[in-house]
Design a protein with these regions (language model features):
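HIT superfamily nucleotide-processing domains
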Residues: 1-140
């Protein structure tokens, strides 16, 4: 995998505001600060996206996510928290080193983060849903 801005941050070539680090992961403030406390969690073992990340690395990420989330909660007491992970250009991934956004949400904030899901439940009947589920199940 080619070098990314995140690998340079891990190596200390680019400064960051470190939040948490262990042998496997590194968490730091996102420079955009979509909301106060917006943090990124990345594995030190680089992979482009979730499709290329091994289960052991994902285990370390899963262990670190609640540590970082709870630190944000204790620091700022947000009303909620989004954890977002994008895979591929068409899913809005901009740095091709797997990463997780922890975005605190505040009732009174106008944070510019519009995250509204449109529902298609009326357009997809139960038979189609069963076929979709079956197609995915066959590949587990």
């Amino acid at each position: 995998m080619s070098e990314t801005i995140f690998s340079k941050i891990i190596d200390g070539e680019i400064p960051s505001y470190k939040i948490y680090e262990n042998d496997y992961v590194y968490a730091f403030l996102d420079i955009s600060q979509v909301s106060k406390g917006h943090t990124l969690l990345i594995p030190k073992k680089a992979s482009e996206n979730i499709f290329e990340t091994d289960p052991e690395t994902m285990k370390h990420i899963a262990e670190a996510l609640p540590i970082v989330a709870n630190a944000i909660k204790k620091a700022f007491n947000p009303d909620g928290l989004n954890i977002i992970q994008n895979n591929g250009e068409y899913a809005s991934q901009s740095v091709f080193h797997i990463h997780f956004h922890l975005i605190p949400r505040y009732k009174e904030d106008i944070d510019g983060f519009g995250y509204i899901w449109n529902t298609n439940e009326d357009q997809i009947d139960d038979e189609q849903k069963a076929k979709i589920a079956e197609a995915i199940q066959k590949n587990v």
